[in-house]
């Protein structure tokens, strides 16, 4: 006798959001870095963790492929992770971060392939990934430090050159 796995589900479930260029059932964030945060050399040197929320139809041995600004980190879901409430906590090593965009938008997204080779979003999906999580990369070591603005000898984040140009 031969055992055959027949699956009628896809990782992340059926995408219920028409028109988006990502799978709505796949969500993630980066531990300690709200979206839009600056990714600087000290953060990159330590690596960071992607927190992937438990998605519909998560199974042991699903392959989670995390796209990190042009490069991939792969993670296989363990039995303990599949049984847990989530999120998956996947380390993105400094070596991968350093390969990514050095200045400007630094995108992180993921897709899932299950053991039957079903990909998130389904067979005909043009976009099998989660919504991109975007950080602001300042990894380029040639960048200058932020300017320091003084208004009446007090450091200020907001300067109105029309009214404060002589300050």
Predicted regions mapped to residue ranges:
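Intrinsically disordered, low-complexity linker/tail regions enriched in polar/charged residues
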Residues: 1-167
């Amino acid at each position: 006798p031969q055992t055959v796995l027949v699956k009628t589900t896809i990782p992340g479930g059926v995408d219920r959001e028409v028109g988006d260029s990502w799978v709505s059932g796949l969500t993630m964030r980066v531990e300690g870095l709200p979206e839009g945060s600056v990714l600087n050399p000290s953060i990159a040197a330590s690596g960071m963790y992607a927190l992937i929320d438990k998605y519909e139809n998560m199974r042991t041995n699903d392959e989670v492929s995390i796209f990190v600004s042009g490069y991939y980190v792969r993670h296989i879901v363990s039995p303990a992770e599949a049984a847990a409430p989530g999120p998956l906590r996947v380390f993105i090593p400094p070596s991968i971060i350093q390969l990514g965009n050095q200045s400007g938008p630094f995108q992180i997204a993921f897709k899932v392939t299950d053991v039957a080779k079903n990909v998130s979003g389904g067979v005909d999906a043009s976009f099998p990934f989660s919504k991109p999580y975007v950080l602001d990369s300042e990894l380029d070591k040639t960048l200058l430090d932020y300017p320091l603005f003084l208004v009446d000898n007090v450091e200020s984040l907001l300067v109105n050159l029309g009214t404060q140009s002589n300050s």
